[in-house]
Amino acid sequence: MSQKIAFITGGNRGLGFQTALELKDAGAKVVIGSRDLAQGERAVAKLCAAGVVAGLLHFDITKAADAQAAYDYFDSRYGRLDILVNNAGIAAGVFPGTGPEHSASEVPSDLLHKVFETNFFAQVALTRALLPLLKKSPAGRIVNLSSILASLTLHADPNSSIYNAKSFAYDASKTALNAFTVHLAWELRDTRVKVNSAHPGWVKTGMGGPQAPMELSEGAKTSAALATLPDDGPTGGFFHLGQPLPW
């Protein structure tokens, strides 16, 4: 088989960048999507210096036209896409916190719409746009970056570690993304495309903060593993470091 082609949104920093590094061992050519062109160029230079075969797509997930542009980019250059990592996303305010931005009863409607637009609607739109190319792959893989905070089962359990860690807009957007994972995996069950959700863990990133217990190298392992699943690997699941999580 020819070299795997991967696309990682938000790949210019944090978990996206680290996932690109992890895919080096899979022999993939990794194209990172970056809203900031200069940051993207610097990230590609670092990836190449580390031995990754890397490319850059100037990409803003919140712009509808960029989904079609991404399709055109991969179709014209490679005719297929093997790996899509839907990594780009935003939080709602500083987390953990107790402000109205975290409250189900008080979160401003414009903030709720903004978080859902980025973390859910834009992910769905991009995946739909690229799906014809993923179906052309002999082993298409879609990884949706979710969070343990998407788990309704754990949020409802007073004994769970996240029972008191609630940020409504962010959590609900990731729960919706998990629903997309389940439904799309079912639709693609008779194809060679696998779809899974990944919880990276609480990682030292711009979103996770310096107090997070996990390093980037560990946080990217779940995404990288799901992006390179064998043919008999799972689909329609929610995982952290190889272990299934409750929905």
Regions found by a protein language model. Give the residues of each.
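Hydrophobic positions on the long internal alpha-helix
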Residues: 85, 126-130, 134, 180-181
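Conserved glycine-rich Rossmann-like NAD(P)H-binding loop of the short-chain dehydrogenase/reductase
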Residues: 26-42
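A glycine-rich helix->loop->beta "capping" turn
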Residues: 50-52, 73-86, 92, 108
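The beta1-alpha1 cofactor-binding region of Rossmann-like NAD(H)/NADP(H)-dependent oxidoreductases
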Residues: 37, 58-70
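Canonical Rossmann dinucleotide-binding motif of NAD(H)/NADP(H)-dependent dehydrogenases/reductases
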Residues: 2-31
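C-terminal helical subdomain
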Residues: 175, 190, 197-198, 205, ...
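Structural signature of the Rossmann-like NAD(P)-dependent dehydrogenase/reductase core
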Residues: 8-9, 86-87, 141-147, 194-199
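Catalytic loop of short-chain dehydrogenase/reductase
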Residues: 90-116, 121, 135-189
